[in-house]
Regions:
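Cys/His-rich Zn2+-binding cysteine-cluster or related metal-binding knuckle/ribbon modules and their
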Residues: 250
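Short, charged, intrinsically disordered terminal tails
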Residues: 268-284
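Acidic/glycine-rich phosphate/pyrophosphate-binding loops and surrounding catalytic core
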Residues: 1-213, 218, 227-235, 241-243, ...
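Short secondary-structure boundary segments
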Residues: 222-223, 246, 268-269
Length: 284
């Protein structure tokens, strides 16, 4: 896990504990002795790319610092029904409290990683990279971004703070591409910030405007056809990175990649996923 992610992950775990356990797991408190210890296993029930084992361990350790965590496979492994990701031993009350929290996290992260791997596979043999977006569940973005990386994809910006991305609304409100880029450069210089600049374009003519304004780090081709994309890549001619976005599906993305774009951003990696089936069960 990246060092900068840890505070977000810790905060998410605390929130998950508050919303699920509240003032106590009364079911376990009333029928499980306080000193009772046991062992459970994380059983995979569906084929896919597993993700979130590292987070599951943090959840368990937060609820029981004495927990014994025996990991058997790594995040990013393709699992099949019957595979065991890890065994965990500790206070039974703590294990039962952690069960749903860690399953919710792992099932979603594994769903994102599995879906990402499908998109990455579609571009096999090409240099184009698959990017995620900011279309994530509020509060879950760090985990979604981690899962995309585990599935073989790449991360776009984390939020509004680590990259300037001039989209259509910014450009329209600023009065056009040239004044928008000029405003960005003036602002970043005044603030002493060194972050990448990306600009969305809606036509081939817009590309000329970007370079007339001094250029950017990356140009995003918004809702271009493959034919337009090929012409756009030729016009950019390697002067900056290129990205295709908008309306690109699993079925059409290779057509765009074959035009030579560096990146394709896909919102479906995180907002149209199916969680991977798994369970945490008692064992000897």
């Amino acid at each position: 896990m990246k060092t900068e992610y840890k505070p977000y992950v810790d905060a998410l775990i605390e929130l998950a504990i508050r919303e699920d356990i509240g003032d106590g797991d009364h079911t376990s408190l009333c029928c499980i002795p306080a000193d009772e210890r046991g062992r459970m296993r994380l059983l995979c029930k569906q084929e896919g790319i597993i993700a979130g084992i590292e987070i599951a361990r943090l959840v368990l350790e937060r609820l029981d610092p004495t927990v014994e965590f025996d990991q058997r496979i790594a995040d990013g492994t393709r699992v099949r029904p019957g595979d065991v990701a890890f065994y965990v031993a500790g206070s039974l009350r703590s294990l039962l409290q952690a069960e749903r929290i860690l399953l919710n996290i792992m099932q979603r992260m594994s769903g994102v990683a599995t879906q990402t791997a499908v998109y990455v596979k579609r571009l096999e043999g090409l240099h184009t990279k698959v990017l995620d977006t900011r279309k994530t569940t509020p509060g879950m973005r760090v985990l979604d971004k981690m899962a995309v990386k585990i599935g073989g994809g790449e991360n776009h910006r984390m939020g509004l703070f680590d990259m300037v991305l001039l989209k259509d609304n910014h450009i329209d409100f600023a009065g056009g591409i040239r004044p928008a880029i000029a405003g960005v450069r003036e602002y970043l210089a005044a603030k002493g910030k060194n972050i990448p600049i990306e600009c969305e374009v809606r036509s081939l003519e817009d590309i000329d405007e970007v370079f007339a304004a001094g250029g950017v780090d990356r140009i995003m081709f918004d809702n271009f056809t493959p034919e337009m994309t090929r012409k756009a890549v030729e016009k950019v001619a390697g002067r900056c990175e290129t990205e295709s976005s908008g309306g690109i599906t699993l079925e059409t993305m290779r057509d765009y990649a074959e035009c030579g774009v560096d990146f394709i951003s896909v919102g479906a990696l995180t907002h149209q996923i199916k969680s991977l089936d798994m369970s945490l069960k008692a064992c000897e």
